[in-house]
Amino acid sequence: MTETRTLQFESPRALQSLYANDIKLLKNLEDSLGVKVTTREGWVKLEGDSNHVDKAQQVFEQLEKARQQGVDIQKHEFNYALKAVSEERDENLGEVVSTKITTSSRKPPIVARSANQRAYVEAIQKHDVVFGIGPAGTGKTYLAVAMAVAALKKEQVARIILTRPAVEAGEALGFLPGDLEQKITPYLRPLYDALREMLEPEEMERAIARQTIEVAPLAYMRGRTLSNAFVILDEAQNTTTEQMFMLLTRIGLNSKCVVTGDVTQIDLPANKRSGVVEALQALKNVPGIATVYFTERDFVRHELVRAIIGAYQQHRSPAPSPRK
């Protein structure tokens, strides 16, 4: 049944703020939900199948509620609300983006971009060991680094330790030319990149020089006790079972450990079992440990990334066998 419905808003400016004053976003809503959208002054008219109009109204209601909660609605927020309604997910945009992490007085706070990201931040706040598992680009490492920097600034910990297995070199770094820093920097570059987005350059250099922030390969954690520290293990799918056990048993008093990885991207030799796969199974019922799983819905990179990954997955999936 075709229906026409008009929604009234407090002012033209308030309405325009719901779609970031970008008419392309309204076109995106039309294409996604199969409705016609007309807006003028402080109202918006929705035309189409009644079920589709219902969904379009839900999108505007979500956005208006978020606006009233103080959310600055931009392209990401609009598309997030649209996708949540399209997929019939019961998520509150305002609650999701109200989760903010302050890492520097000179830089804007880091904001959760999805319900899973919000759950991840809350899990890190409440638990001493957290596993963040899911595809690249979903914010696992970025949010963990933000939480670590925030904890350091609040003096909740005395240092940050960022580590990942240098699986590309089999962790046998000794044969590479240069000093230790020159050998390991290429493998740890993503962690440095995250830090640079959250700290001023001189602040980051000073913290690394004083070893308040330490970035090192996983092999260099052996034999240590990591007390009063926020430890992040990145690319954990490429740890062996022995390495994962080693790291988790290094955690000392007043420490947190966040382990991130993508179990679909394991680069270990075929005869080696991933340490994170074993840990997820062995530790699932241990109090004080939480696991948050991310999906393609949580992508925070360029919106084309989702389409690229989907296209590759479809291309690489085996073709069905012909019937005999």
What are these regions (language model features)?
Residues 9-11, 39-41, 48, 164, ...:
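Flexible glycine-/small-residue-rich
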Residues 105-115, 122-233, 237-324:
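Conserved helicase motor core of SF1/SF2 NTP-dependent helicases
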Residues 18, 56-59, 244:
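Hydrophobic side chains in well-ordered alpha-helices
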Residues 14-31:
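Short amphipathic alpha-helix segments
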Residues 82-113, 125:
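Proteins enriched for Cys/Gly/acidic motifs involved in redox and nucleic-acid/cofactor modification
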Residues 27, 33-36, 40-42:
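Compact, well-ordered interaction domains used in eukaryotic information-processing assemblies
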Residues 1-16:
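Short glycine-/aliphatic-rich beta-strand segments at the starts of folded cytosolic domains
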Residues 38-97:
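Interdomain "pre-motor" coupling segment immediately N-terminal to P-loop NTPase/helicase cores
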